[in-house]
Amino acid sequence: MAAVGASATPLTNTKSTAEPVRPVANFPPSVWGDLFLSFSLDKSIMEEYAEAMEEPKEQVRRLILDPTMDSNKKLSLIYTVHRLGLTYMFLKEIEAQLDRLFKEFNLEDYVELDLYTISINFQAFRHLGYKLPCDVFNKFKNDDSTTFKESITGDVRGMLGLYESAQLRLKGENILDEASAFAETKLKSLVNTLEGSLAQQVKQSLRRPFHQGMPMVEARLYFSNYQEECSAHDSILKLAKLHFNYLQLQQKEELRIVSQWWKDMRFQETTPYIRDRVPEIYLWILGLYFEPRYSLARIIATKITLFLVVLDDTYDAYATIEEIRLLTDAINRWDISAMNQIPEYIRPFYKILLDEYAELEKQLAKEGRANSVIASKEAFQDIARGYLEEAEWTNSGYVASFPEYMKNGLITSAYNVISKSALVGMGEIVSEDALVWYESHPQILQASELISRLQDDVMTYQFERERGQSATGVDSYIKTYGVSEKVAIDELKKMIENAWKEINEGCLKPREVSMDLLAPILNLARMIDVVYRYDDGFTFPGKTLKEYITLLFVGSSPM
């Protein structure tokens, strides 16, 4: 059944005397309660951190620009700065150094280098957008070029670097496909024999490679697990810890603001069936951009994504099919006069939704940037229509073909709403040209969107089956291609792997748009991995997300 289009004619809210049967999900409650509401920001402490950062920041800048530093040490320094989440502070200086070093690259210079050094150099270039050739790893393969040399397995740090490097591979880079499988197998066999910080480094990488992790969490773990690497330059470690504590205060204040807003909106009272996940949603948005200048953007995007949670859970876990049709029509109309046609329990949400968007549009119109709000609103309407289509399929027992499922599933993944809402508060960088580029649906965006859909499906399909929800991508793939459940999951994982390669390609220079605009696209794919790699971390946040929220917002970094 085709998605319902925008309609100017209101549907009728016909009341039934019988109490409707509702697909209530009984989601677990919030594990945080009002913990983050009690935070009180002391701006003087933030100012102290900001002032304390100036000296080590200047010391790190001088190190990056040091003309006497050996090129391999310079690349190691840049890699460490990047892993610690400090790149944005020194972007011009770092790019100037990498431009020069990349032009000077000569494969012969790598012949005598060890695996660890080559891996660090490779990652430093690739993470910052420079396509260093993967041929630098050829020397570690046997003469027949079919397998890697067993001798390198004794260099655990080098193997770890090889594994992390392989996550940056592109399509056609077969040596890195082989490197990923080889290094992962060997590291898994060695991890229980390791001790100290190296054991922690390997465990963390096998759990989730840096490239697929949440930047703020990865930075925090790096200066905890890589003290030796950071200690080469005391100023870097000092800056990283001060930076983390500064950001933590800012972000705890943002979390308090959205938590208070959520409480004031009374969604848990008017729509008590929904998932109460304010810290989790804020964490998700923080994963898109952690830099101080995006504070307003995080608050706006968190609020819009919380609206999305209410909508999703209403469609999935409470509303009847008749109510879903009425609500979809009202969202298509986007007019307060449509409120009378929808059930009373969802009217407060509908009014708040319209009011918040109207206020956003009014604010950004003053700056000439209202189009980003309009794009977010239209994406919200699209997802409502997509949710309706899923509900119609569930209601009729229809299992869509895989291509049909994906066409609608990419919409209902919520990717489009979140990615466009993330742009709303980013400021002048979101120009008309940037919005046109987003609307053109470039390859990197398609790849990130696909990961968002399929990673979710692979992890949640059994839970959705048990709840009697619409078929996921796993079910549709099984039906369409007549394969087993295992084969279907393996094929979807291959699609996810290939999508990561396309994202990696899209982040390399020359880029279609600035990395500031590409970062949320890359980071949305990363956050999907964080939330859904091992379980449905959003519905059941007691594991990974609780760990991450505790790490970032409960307790500062010891100096």
Curated annotation (Swiss-Prot):
It catalyses: (2E,6E)-farnesyl diphosphate = (+)-(R)-germacrene A + diphosphate. Mainly expressed in sunflower trichomes. Its cofactor is Mg(2+). InterPro entries: Isoprenoid_synthase_dom_sf, Terpene_cyclase-like_1_C, Terpene_cyclase_plant_C1, Terpene_synth_N, Terpene_synth_N_sf, Terpene_synthase-like, Terpene_synthase_metal-bd, Terpenoid_cyclase/PrenylTrfase. The Asp-Asp-Xaa-Xaa-Asp/Glu (DDXXD/E) motif is important for the catalytic activity, presumably through binding to Mg(2+). Optimum pH is 7.7. Gene3D superfamilies: Farnesyl Diphosphate Synthase (1.10.600.10), Terpene synthase, N-terminal domain (1.50.10.130). Mg(2+) 3 binds at residues 456, 460, 464. Binds 3 Mg(2+) ions per subunit. This is Germacrene A synthase 1. GO terms for biological process: diterpenoid biosynthetic process; sesquiterpene biosynthetic process. It comes from Helianthus annuus.
